[in-house]
A protein has these predicted regions:
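Glycine-/small-residue-enriched transmembrane alpha-helix faces in small-molecule transporters
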Residues: 1-33, 144-180, 187-188
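Structural signature of hydrophobic alpha-helical transmembrane segments
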Residues: 2-13, 60-73, 118-128, 180-188
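Residue-level signature of transmembrane alpha-helical cores of multipass secondary-active transporters
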Residues: 7-8, 66-67, 82, 124, ...
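Hydrophobic/small/kink-forming positions within alpha-helical transmembrane segments
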Residues: 16, 71, 75, 102-106, ...
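C-terminal ends of transmembrane helices
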Residues: 18-28, 75-92, 134-143, 196-206
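Hydrophobic/aromatic residues within transmembrane alpha-helices
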Residues: 25, 35, 84, 110-112, ...
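Hydrophobic transmembrane alpha-helices of multi-pass small-molecule transport proteins
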Residues: 42, 47, 106-109, 119-138
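Conserved small/polar residues in nucleotide/adenosyl-binding loops
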Residues: 227-233
Length: 237
């Protein structure tokens, strides 16, 4: 219980720090796909010791299937997250992340057949009630009019994809362990974000952006990578 509580606390702190760094990067007009690719690349490099000691041929197909699907959802989710941060305010976008547990619970019931406890249901009710007071401070109020805002829409897209990703990540953990799950999460996130980034690399402006901002990238994106080191350990929170 103590380790779980510490991991959740670290998850909350690291996620907040990551959002701040990502916001700084988008302020420099750096492409969201590039931000996420470098993040996943940094994490994959951190996983090299695990990769060297891993015998991949022994893994069942369930691990590969869930890891690939999780990588696809993660690449899309994190890219939408950065787009949301580019257009919105952290004070408004942050509380939306609380809904991730709600969405993850729904997909957990469908894909993992997990039934939430009474405590979990009470927590979800508190999340919804709390978000009412946050969004009620906006001009649109707590209503579907909020979805007309681009930043809110992007944040909900990110929430849905990362919540689905969390279910796939948990499946990988169930078939292996946290270290293997983290390795696959980082690697396939890098692969699929790289695929999304490829069309942009044909643009000379994008290439010039990478070259001219490389110092800023490495002083801001590496911290983003490090703050994500705790994410897969508590994917569903």
């Amino acid at each position: 219980m103590g380790i779980t509580f510490f991991a959740i606390l670290l998850r909350i702190i690291s996620n907040s720090m990551s959002n701040v760094y990502q916001k700084q990067l988008t302020a420099k007009a750096i492409d969201p796909f590039l931000i996420n690719f470098i993040m996943y690349l940094g994490l994959t490099i951190c996983c090299i010791p695990i990769i060297i000691r891993t015998t991949f041929l022994t893994f069942p197909h369930q691990i590969w299937t869930n890891a690939i699907l999780g990588g696809m959802c993660g690449a899309l989710g994190n890219s939408y997250l950065v787009k949301a941060l580019k257009n919105g305010e952290l004070s408004i976008l942050g509380p939306i992340n609380a809904y991730k547990s709600v969405v993850a619970m729904i997909f957990g019931i469908i894909l993992l057949h997990e039934i939430p406890s009474i405590t979990g249901l009470v927590g979800i009710i508190l999340i919804i009630c709390g978000s009412y007071f946050v969004f009620d401070t906006q001009e649109e109020g707590f209503s579907f009019k909020l979805l007309k805002r681009k930043d809110i829409r992007y944040r909900f897209y990110a929430l849905i994809f990362t919540a689905i990703e969390a279910v796939f990540v948990k499946n990988v953990i169930l078939y292996s362990d946290i270290k293997i799950s983290f390795m696959f999460w980082s690697f396939f996130g890098m692969v699929f974000t790289g695929i999304l980034l490829l069309p942009k690399l044909t643009n000379l402006t994008s290439l010039n952006q990478i070259l001219t901002t490389k110092k800023f990238i490495f002083t801001r994106l590496l911290p983003v990578s490090y703050t994500h080191l705790t994410l897969p350990t508590n994917s569903l929170v």
